[in-house]
């Protein structure tokens, strides 16, 4: 895992097309902005895990998503 320190307004690059910008810090919360092409899905981890679980449930029951 790469660990970086960024200040509000600073950005990091992931590849050539994805940027992550620190928008704000308040207490123990950090607001970030992600710019990525439409074909790259961006989800919070808990949403991604729910999507994967639903895919697995649908595949197990023979349904296509």
UniProtKB/Swiss-Prot annotation:
Single GO molecular function: mRNA 5'-UTR binding
InterPro entries: CsrA, CsrA_sf
GO biological process terms, semicolon-separated: mRNA catabolic process; negative regulation of translational initiation; positive regulation of translational initiation; regulation of carbohydrate metabolic process
Keywords: Activator, Cytoplasm, Repressor, RNA-binding, Translation regulation
Subcellular location(s) of the protein: Cytoplasm
SUBUNIT field: Homodimer; the beta-strands of each monomer intercalate to form a hydrophobic core, while the alpha-helices form wings that extend away from the core.
Task of the protein: A key translational regulator that binds mRNA to regulate translation initiation and/or mRNA stability. Mediates global changes in gene expression, shifting from rapid growth to stress survival by linking envelope stress, the stringent response and the catabolite repression systems. Usually binds in the 5'-UTR; binding at or near the Shine-Dalgarno sequence prevents ribosome-binding, repressing translation, binding elsewhere in the 5'-UTR can activate translation and/or stabilize the mRNA. Its function is antagonized by small RNA(s).
Protein name: Translational regulator CsrA
Gene: csrA
């Amino acid at each position: 895992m790469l660990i970086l320190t960024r200040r509000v307004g600073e950005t990091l690059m992931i590849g050539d097309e994805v940027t992550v910008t620190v928008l704000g810090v308040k207490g123990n919360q950090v607001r970030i902005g992600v710019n990525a092409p439409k074909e790259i899905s961006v989800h919070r981890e808990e949403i991604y895990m729910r999507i994967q679980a639903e895919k697995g449930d649908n595949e197990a029951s023979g349904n296509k998503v």
